[in-house]
């Protein structure tokens, strides 16, 4: 067991239950775990010593919502959207066609590159989804690929999103027969979660229930895309199924907020203990890219609901892995404090993946996921938006950047 002392930390944001922010601090890492946290002057000896020279350190980002398995380019579609023009050649179908045509090696190379970009920006725990295959064979291929990358430690959580969209030329109910039958059977050993896009133009409440029920029966956890396009049944279905998270949440009724808040009655936010409810996943980069209303993170937090921030990296509506950007946006545009935004991008994401006992905060015994900023304090994430502030990253105890 080899130990490393990371010291000379100007500001250490722990996101622990006390919300401690330490100054002149140090962390000791043993193998892949945190072994000690405290004042630098009291730090124990270690095999190796790394000085961060007066920089700030916080937990690595937990990106709880991404779509990394894709090929193709949709920049013309984005340009048209920014100009307020229609673009008939766009949409998920474009990505599906390009992704189906790509070889396994090509897709693996693309995913590796996107993960590398994410880690270079401070992300240390990643969820990603299938959903650009939309046939039994392709969804199974993408799930196998992601499971292999998970074994390598490149991604951490794999989600089955066969119910992303009804493919062109398919009847919705006929397609769902595939999703809950042979498609689910082919991916269940590779995925930990089932997801559905429950919204206008995708799947309605009953269709969503059908997929989620099948996923639960197959042993998968539940997450959901909901209430992105308009206020609808997504949040209600997520609560009904005890989903770990419902993501997008741009359009919420008072009843939606009340329902989400009701799932958190067994959770004590101050001590970060108890039974977590359904996390409200906010995706600000996507909201900006689609010129949608920003998700009401302030309203959700004030109602007692845990919120996550995630990149939603995908080729159509949020082609970025930058969690720094999302955190800065949450402070500048969504009325979160820095502490709230950092918590949402770390512990909030971990709660939405039910991984809060392993990651999401800097505490003894947790995975050593550290993000060192090229700045003396974490507020620089919002104070200096768009700047390349990631200086170093430890992921599971190993220096990754």
UniProtKB/Swiss-Prot annotation:
Subcellular location: Cytoplasm
Family affiliation: Belongs to the metallo-dependent hydrolases superfamily. HutI family.
Keyword Secreted among UniProt keywords: no
Pathway note: Amino-acid degradation; L-histidine degradation into L-glutamate; N-formimidoyl-L-glutamate from L-histidine: step 3/3
EC number: 3.5.2.7
Name this polypeptide is given: Imidazolonepropionase
Binding positions (Zn(2+)): 65, 67, 225
GO molecular function: imidazolonepropionase activity; iron ion binding; zinc ion binding
Amino-acid positions noted as binding 4-imidazolone-5-propanoate in the UniProt annotation, renumbered to this chain: 74, 132, 164, 228, 317
Top-level taxon of origin: Bacteria
Alphabetically ordered keywords of this record: Cytoplasm, Histidine metabolism, Hydrolase, Iron, Metal-binding, Zinc
Gene Ontology biological-process annotations: L-histidine catabolic process to glutamate and formamide; L-histidine catabolic process to glutamate and formate
GO cellular component labels: cytoplasm
Pfam families: Amidohydro_1
Necessary cofactors: Zn(2+); Fe(3+)
Gene behind this protein: hutI
HAMAP family with a match to the protein in the record: HutI
């Amino acid at each position: 067991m080899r130990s490393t002392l990371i010291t000379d930390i100007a500001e250490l944001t722990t996101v622990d239950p006390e919300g401690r922010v330490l100054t002149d601090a140090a962390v000791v890492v043993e193998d892949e775990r945190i072994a000690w946290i405290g004042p630098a002057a009291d730090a124990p000896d270690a095999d190796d010593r790394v000085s961060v020279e007066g920089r700030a350190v916080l937990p690595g980002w937990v990106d709880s919502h991404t779509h990394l398995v894709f090929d193709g380019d949709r920049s013309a579609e984005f340009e048209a959207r920014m100009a307020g023009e229609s673009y008939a050649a766009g949409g998920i179908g474009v990505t599906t066609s390009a992704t189906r045509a790509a070889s396994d090696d090509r897709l693996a190379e693309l995913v590796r590159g996107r993960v590398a970009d994410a880690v270079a920006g401070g992300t240390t725990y990643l969820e990603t989804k299938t959903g650009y295959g939309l046939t039994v064979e392709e969804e199974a291929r993408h799930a196998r690929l992601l499971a292999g990358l998970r074994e390598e430690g490149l991604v951490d959580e794999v989600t089955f999103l066969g119910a992303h969209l009804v493919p062109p030329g398919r009847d919705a109910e006929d397609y769902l027969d595939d999703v809950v039958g042979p498609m689910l059977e082919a991916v269940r050993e590779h995925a930990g979660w089932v997801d559905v896009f429950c919204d206008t133009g995708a799947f309605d409440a009953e269709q969503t229930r059908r997929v989620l029920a099948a996923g639960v029966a197959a042993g998968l956890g539940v997450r959901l895309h909901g209430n992105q396009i308009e206020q609808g049944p997504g949040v209600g279905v997520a609560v009904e199924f005890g989903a770990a998270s419902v993501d997008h949440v741009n359009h919420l009724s008072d009843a939606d907020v009340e329902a989400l808040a009701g799932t958190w009655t067994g959770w004590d936010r101050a001590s970060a203990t108890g039974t977590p409810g359904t996390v409200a996943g906010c995706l600000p980069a996507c909201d900006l890219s689609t010129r949608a209303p920003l998700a009401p993170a302030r309203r959700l937090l004030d109602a007692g609901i845990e919120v996550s921030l995630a990149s939603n990296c995908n080729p159509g509506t949020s082609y970025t892995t930058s969690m720094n950007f999302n955190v800065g946006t949450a402070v500048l545009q969504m009325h979160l404090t820095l502490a709230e935004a950092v918590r949402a991008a770390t512990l909030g994401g971990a709660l939405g993946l039910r991984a809060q006992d392993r990651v999401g905060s800097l505490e003894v015994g947790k995975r050593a996921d550290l993000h060192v900023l090229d700045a003396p304090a974490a507020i620089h994430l919002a104070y200096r938006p768009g700047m390349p502030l990631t200086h170093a990253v430890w992921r599971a105890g190993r220096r990754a950047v």
